Amino acid sequence: MNNNTTAPTYTLRGLQLIGWRDMQHALDYLFADGQLKQGTLVAINAEKMLTIEDNAEVRELINAAEFKYADGISVVRSVRKKYPQAQVSRVAGADLWEELMARAGKEGTPVFLVGGKPEVLAQTEAKLRNQWNVNIVGSQDGYFKPEQRQALFERIHASGAQIVTVAMGSPKQEIFMRDCRLVHPDALYMGVGGTYDVFTGHVKRAPKIWQTLGLEWLYRLLSQPSRIKRQLRLLRYLRWHYTGNL
């Protein structure tokens, strides 16, 4: 019988990743023995692997995060290639966030939301309350000045939030979470990128069949041709994968 409250780790190019078998494993791991874990969740895909390789500050930030997991299918395939016995699957960050919010609503876990446009954040709050009765104890859109950060950290601490989700894009959200944890360490932090936009319908995700086939990247490219430069950059990751330089 599998123990869902523990998980193996796998190393790709020096980065340690948690190996979750599926979404249920991820949730059981994060809520082991009914106690929500504390630390920082970071989704890892091929693009982020390249950024880690090229940017020492980002590498240090992400290495310090406790829970790094495979959000991209390319990363999952690389783990399976390097560790043939690995039982690891993709856990999409947007899906994990929704499942965490549903669980938080069920258990009354206090949540603080950071980031996004004001109108998107307001819609996110309303939908979370209506859909799962989430206990949102505070929020702040992404349009605040650097000199306001410390006061925001204090607000988060005073709120007693046990889950803090930050939608600011990488590496801004990782920097924010690192600094906020100095003031409010007793929480689970999650960087969620554009998840609020997807959740409220402002941005469309790839249909399920594209996700299942591992072609979400292609759907995004067809929807946003301007992403071509970002996609071409990923050829370097493919070279690592196919040459076994993992």
Swiss-Prot record:
It comes from the Bacteria. One of its GO terms (molecular function) is lipopolysaccharide N-acetylmannosaminouronosyltransferase activity. InterPro entries: UDP-ManNAcA_Trfase_WecG, WecG_TagA_CpsF. CDD domains: Glyco_transf_WecG_TagA. GO terms for biological process: enterobacterial common antigen biosynthetic process. Keywords: Glycosyltransferase, Transferase. It catalyses: UDP-N-acetyl-alpha-D-mannosaminouronate + N-acetyl-alpha-D-glucosaminyl-di-trans,octa-cis-undecaprenyl diphosphate = beta-D-ManNAcA-(1->4)-alpha-D-GlcNAc-di-trans,octa-cis-undecaprenyl diphosphate + UDP + H(+). Its EC number is 2.4.1.180. It is an enzyme of class 2 (transferase). Pathway: Bacterial outer membrane biogenesis; enterobacterial common antigen biosynthesis. NCBIfam families: PRK03692.1 (NF002980), wecG_tagA_cpsF (TIGR00696). HAMAP family: WecG_RffM. Catalyzes the synthesis of Und-PP-GlcNAc-ManNAcA (Lipid II), the second lipid-linked intermediate involved in enterobacterial common antigen (ECA) synthesis. Belongs to the glycosyltransferase 26 family. PANTHER family: PTHR34136, UDP-N-ACETYL-D-MANNOSAMINURONIC ACID TRANSFERASE (PTHR34136:SF1). This is UDP-N-acetyl-D-mannosaminuronic acid transferase. It comes from Escherichia coli O139:H28 (strain E24377A / ETEC). The gene is wecG.
